[in-house]
């Protein structure tokens, strides 16, 4: 029987560290449910000690998800570890993930600790955590750039104190596949008790090799856990992409010889959900989940695929969730058809009340555009008004007037803590006028650093999906809004971003 490769998803923790990718508790919970449907083995739900918001999100996910192991990150100190354990109390399967830097550069410049102090803190923290939960992961931050002799000592001590998983991060994406694979192999050979723990890889994509490095760590190094994110989401150039590493191992089972527990047919739904929640669009030619991933433009290729798909396709599109038969809904579609399509798309709403609310919004949209595509439905249920989070600001209605040669004017009605507010302003265009009207009342002081519009489907009556990125006091958030009217979508996106600025407490930055 082949070994199993453990898939550790850190979209909700490391992925969220991408500037602007912050998520609300309910958004995280919705994605966690999709990850459970995808059958990932471990979900790193957050960094419980970093903020009350992260603690609440970890606790909510731990109390809801039953199949996957739920993990919280923690620094190597008693306070962080105790906070993580508290957040994980409701979990069916709990893991605490402890990290401390071990490279000379990080120890000297960041921690201001000696190697001896780092070694002592490592073993003490694992010992403390082991008394709280049985499943402990230990990560020597910047492990790939650490002195091998010192790193072996730290890892040996961590395993001796009860660490069940040893994760070796390439924190800054410096590794090369062959070198990284040999590095993992060397550590496993030199650490005397290496067989007492599962070895894991965590690679960043700064040189574009996160997936290749992770696979080298598995094949050459003997790692049996890969840490990754949906769409490769993560700070800087991102993390190892879950969908790519999973399909590489599945498609080339002849080479890797490993089993996976992943339900790959739910990959596309997970990708779309993360993209629409964070506002980070998936590039068209992205492997596995990009819109062109299974498209053939060359006449020769098209002819070959029509005769036999395996002439130019190494995997089946439907195996990752693409469907050749798209069900198009419309205004005559009933609640049962809508609910069934939600299930097929991997969307789970908590209650009948939420389904009713989503269906009402679906019918409202169907009155405005004749055909409702999958992308429309996903955008609709990703809207924060369905998420259930407490919002300080909410969109009600908008009127805008624009005429050639005259300055556009907008009047908008929105709620502030449940009370209707009316505002109006002029601007350089209808979007500018609408957002100025909002800002004239809320006085957020935030700077807009990104405004982008994407058509959700391909026709002129398509919904527009707007992403607004705001920066204030060093914090960056993305807001996403969708509507057939781009001006309305822009206002919704702006409110979404404002709510995140209000709701998100400052966080402790974590690396890994």
From Swiss-Prot:
Pyruvate carboxyltransferase domain location: 5-268
GO biological process annotation, one example: L-leucine biosynthetic process
Reaction catalyzed: 3-methyl-2-oxobutanoate + acetyl-CoA + H2O = (2S)-2-isopropylmalate + CoA + H(+)
Amino-acid biosynthesis keyword on record: yes
Keywords linked to the UniProt accession: Amino-acid biosynthesis, Branched-chain amino acid biosynthesis, Cytoplasm, Leucine biosynthesis, Manganese, Metal-binding, Transferase
Binding site for Mn(2+): 14, 202, 204, 239
Annotated spans, Regulatory domain: 394-512
Top EC group: transferase
Phosphoprotein listed as a keyword: no
Pathway(s) annotated for this protein in UniProt: Amino-acid biosynthesis; L-leucine biosynthesis; L-leucine from 3-methyl-2-oxobutanoate: step 1/4
Database matches in InterPro entries: 2-IPM_HCS-like (IPR050073), 2-isopropylmalate_synth_dimer (IPR013709), AIPM/Hcit_synth_CS (IPR002034), Aldolase_TIM (IPR013785), LeuA/HCS_post-cat (IPR054691), LeuA_allosteric_dom_sf (IPR036230), LeuA_bact_synth (IPR005671), PYR_CT (IPR000891)
Family: Belongs to the alpha-IPM synthase/homocitrate synthase family. LeuA type 1 subfamily.
NCBIfam families: leuA_bact, PRK00915.1-3, PRK00915.1-4
HAMAP family in the cross-refs: LeuA_type1
Protein name (database record): 2-isopropylmalate synthase
Annotated organism of origin: Verminephrobacter eiseniae (strain EF01-2)
């Amino acid at each position: 029987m082949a070994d199993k490769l453990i898939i550790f998803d850190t979209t909700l923790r490391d992925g969220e560290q991408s500037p602007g990718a912050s998520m609300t508790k309910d958004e995280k919970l919705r994605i966690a449910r999709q990850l459970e449907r995808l059958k990932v083995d471990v979900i790193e739900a957050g960094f419980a000690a970093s903020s009350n918001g992260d603690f609440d999100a970890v606790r909510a996910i731990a109390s809801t998800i039953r199949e996957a192991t739920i993990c919280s990150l923690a620094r190597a100190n008693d306070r962080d570890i105790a906070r993580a354990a508290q957040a994980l109390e409701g979990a069916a399967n709990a893991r605490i993930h402890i990290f401390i830097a071990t490279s000379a550069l990080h120890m000297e410049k960041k921690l201001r600790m000696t190697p001896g102090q780092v070694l002592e803190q490592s073993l003490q923290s694992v010992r403390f955590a082991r008394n709280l939960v049985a499943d402990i992961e230990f990560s020597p931050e910047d492990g790939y750039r650490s002195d091998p002799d010192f790193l072996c000592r730290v890892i040996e001590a961590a395993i001796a104190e009860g660490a069940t998983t040893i994760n070796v991060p390439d924190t800054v994406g410096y590794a090369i596949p062959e070198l990284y694979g040999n590095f993992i192999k060397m550590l496993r050979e030199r650490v005397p008790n290496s067989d007492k723990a599962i070895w894991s890889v965590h690679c960043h994509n700064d040189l574009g090799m996160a997936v290749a490095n992770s696979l080298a760590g598995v094949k050459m190094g003997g790692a049996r856990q890969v840490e990754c994110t949906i769409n490769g989401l993560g700070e800087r150039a991102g993390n190892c992409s879950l969908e790519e590493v999973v399909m590489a191992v599945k498609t080339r089972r002849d080479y890797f010889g490993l089993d996976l527990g992943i339900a790959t047919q739910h990959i596309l739904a997970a990708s779309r959900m993360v993209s629409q929640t964070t506002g980070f669009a998936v590039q068209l030619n992205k492997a596995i989940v990009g819109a062109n991933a299974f498209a053939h433009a060359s006449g020769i290729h098209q002819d070959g695929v029509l005769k036999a798909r395996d002439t130019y396709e190494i995997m089946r599109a439907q195996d990752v969730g693409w469907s050749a038969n798209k069900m198009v809904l419309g205004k005559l579609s009933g609640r049962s058809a809508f609910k069934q399509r939600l299930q097929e798309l991997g969307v789970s709403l908590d209650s009948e009340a939420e389904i009713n609310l989503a269906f009402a919004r679906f019918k409202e949209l169907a009155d405005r555009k004749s055909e409702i595509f999958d992308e429309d439905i996903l955008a609709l249920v990703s809207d924060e008004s369905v998420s259930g989070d407490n919002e300080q600001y909410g969109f009600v209605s908008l009127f805008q007037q624009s005429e050639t040669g005259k300055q556009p004017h907008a009047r908008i009605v929105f709620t502030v803590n449940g009370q209707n507010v009316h505002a109006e302003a002029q601007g350089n265009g209808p979007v500018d006028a609408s957002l100025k009207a909002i800002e004239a009342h809320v006085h957020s002081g935030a700077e807009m650093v990104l405004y982008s519009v994407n058509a959700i489907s391909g026709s002129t009556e398509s919904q527009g999906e707007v992403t607004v990125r705001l920066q204030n006091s060093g914090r960056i958030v993305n807001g996403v809004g969708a509507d057939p009217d781009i001006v309305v979508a822009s206002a919704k996106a702006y409110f979404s971003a404002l709510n995140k600025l209000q709701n998100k407490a400052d966080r402790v930055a974590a690396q890994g």
